[in-house]
Amino acid sequence: MLSRAVCGTGRQLAPALGYLGSRQKHSLPDLPYDYGALEPHINAQIMQLHHSKHHAAYVNNLNVTEEKYQEALAKGDVTAQIALQPALKFNGGGHINHSIFWTNLSPNGGGEPKGELLEAIKRDFGSFEKFKEKLTAASVGVQGSGWGWLGFNKERGQLQIAACPNQDPLQGTTGLIPLLGIDVWEHAYYLQYKNVRPDYLKAIWNVINWENVTERYMACKK
């Protein structure tokens, strides 16, 4: 099962990307809203396919890959262990990223964050609008498939924007703790926005769950 902790997600799932021994299989998390709840910004067909097909595939493939990895460990087959690393990273990252993504969205979302998160955004980016522009640009600018992220640099105590290719998990790739992720794989928007990724980015700001992002930020500051 994916840890429900909002801080240190990469560390919580780290065992899934290279361990062994007994474990529970990963499972597809339920959405905290109906498939059609984010309309008109993200339609129900996209949400259903994205969650029940794409995310489910990452979960299933992660479980299969981990079983193979355990077998390779038991046999002492280092070559097989190395060969399985890309699949662990891809499917484990897909599971981590999407589990964050669903909670980052809400039919009651949009607007601006409040309190300490808003103050931190103003401190590190100048204003909320400048932050939106920078994260939008980073997300639109991803070549091919990937993610745009707002992350927290715990060592510096600062918010940072980053982009990761494919399903590379933010924390495992950059060390930043994920607060807000924007999926820019085509399966996240193509059925509604076709090849116009900027329109999808413009729409998704209307359903950002700032309460969830703030919760993640406050947890990581402790």
UniProtKB/Swiss-Prot annotation:
Q: What class of enzyme is it?
A: oxidoreductase
Record EC number: 1.15.1.1
* UniProt PTM: Nitrated under oxidative stress. Nitration coupled with oxidation inhibits the catalytic activity.
SUPFAM superfamilies assigned to the protein according to its UniProt record, in alphabetical order: Fe,Mn superoxide dismutase (SOD), C-terminal domain, Fe,Mn superoxide dismutase (SOD), N-terminal domain
Q: Which residues bind Mn(2+)?
A: 50, 98, 183, 187
**What residues bear N6-acetyllysine in this entry?**
68, 75, 114, 122, 130, 202
UniProt cross-references to Gene3D superfamilies, sorted A to Z: Fe,Mn superoxide dismutase (SOD) domain (1.10.287.990), Iron/manganese superoxide dismutase, C-terminal domain (3.55.40.20)
Q: Which GO terms describe its biological process?
A: cellular response to oxidative stress; regulation of transcription by RNA polymerase II; superoxide metabolic process
Residue numbers carrying 3'-nitrotyrosine: 58
Q: Which cofactor does it need?
A: Mn(2+)
Reaction(s) catalyzed by this protein?
2 superoxide + 2 H(+) = H2O2 + O2
What superkingdom does the record give?
Eukaryota
Task: Give the CC-aspect GO terms.
Answer: mitochondrial matrix
User: In the record, what terms sit under GO molecular function?
Assistant: manganese ion binding; superoxide dismutase activity
State the function annotated in the UniProt record: Destroys superoxide anion radicals which are normally produced within the cells and which are toxic to biological systems.
Official protein name in the record: Superoxide dismutase [Mn], mitochondrial
Organism annotation: Macaca fascicularis
Gene that encodes the chain = SOD2
